[in-house]
Regions:
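Short helix-to-loop capping/linker segments positioned immediately adjacent to catalytic or ligand/cofactor-binding
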Residues: 8-9, 73-78
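Catalytic core of nucleotide-sugar-dependent glycosyltransferases
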Residues: 33-42, 48-75, 94, 98-124
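Amphipathic alpha-helical repeat scaffolds of TPR domains
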Residues: 83-98
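Residues within HEAT/ARM-like alpha-solenoid scaffolds
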Residues: 57, 61, 79-87
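Membrane-interface aromatic/basic loop that binds lipid-linked glycans or pyrophosphate carriers
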Residues: 101-163
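Short, surface-exposed acidic
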Residues: 76-81, 126-127
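Conserved nucleotide-sugar donor-binding catalytic segment
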Residues: 1-52
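Short charge-dense sequence patches
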Residues: 7-19, 62-66, 146-162
Length: 163
């Protein structure tokens, strides 16, 4: 019913795969079944910082698809809408972090475009996504803002241990 089609030859589609069909979901059942085992720490993994920076265009594509899939407020139950806005804010922030970590001025413009595209797709969705604390933190302006975000990533990586 959802018409889900994953972009071909693209990493990070799990964000989109677990997001786009939600408006059609009537019931969720958790199965504690290990369908695959993910080995963290292997060289060249798609979640390593340097790999994610190299593949940031794929993160951006997934983000664009997620924006397109986000329902307008009032068209789905409020709890679902809030969840989807929360998920979109997180994924948009992840993409923004790696655009900033790249230290590429063209990617800084792409980060600004990412947030502008959300606003353009729907002012209501843009407003709701930007209200999230993580979204506000990732939109600190200028070189000082980018420095704070880079340092924040380093601290968060040490505390949480993403990679």
């Amino acid at each position: 019913d959802s018409g889900l089609q994953l972009p071909e030859h693209t990493f990070y589609v799990d964000f989109y795969y677990s997001y786009q069909p939600f408006p059609w979901v009537k019931r969720i059942q958790y199965l504690d079944v290990p369908f695959y085992h993910y080995f963290i720490g292997r060289e060249g993994q798609s979640v390593q910082t340097d790999v994610m920076i190299r593949r940031v265009a794929q993160l951006r594509l997934v983000n664009q698809r997620m924006v397109e899939a986000t329902p307008e407020p009032g068209t789905v139950p409020d709890g679902l809408y809030r969840y989807m806005i929360h998920f979109l804010a997180i994924e948009s922030s992840v993409t923004s972090v790696f655009l900033i970590l790249s230290k590429d001025k063209a990617n800084y413009r792409l980060k600004d475009e990412l947030w502008a595209d959300i606003d353009k797709a729907s002012p209501a969705i843009g407003r709701d996504v930007r209200r999230k604390l993580v979204s506000r933190a990732l939109n600190l302006r200028g070189s000082v803002g980018r420095w704070v975000i880079r340092r924040g990533y380093v601290v968060a990586e040490k505390v949480v241990g993403f990679n």
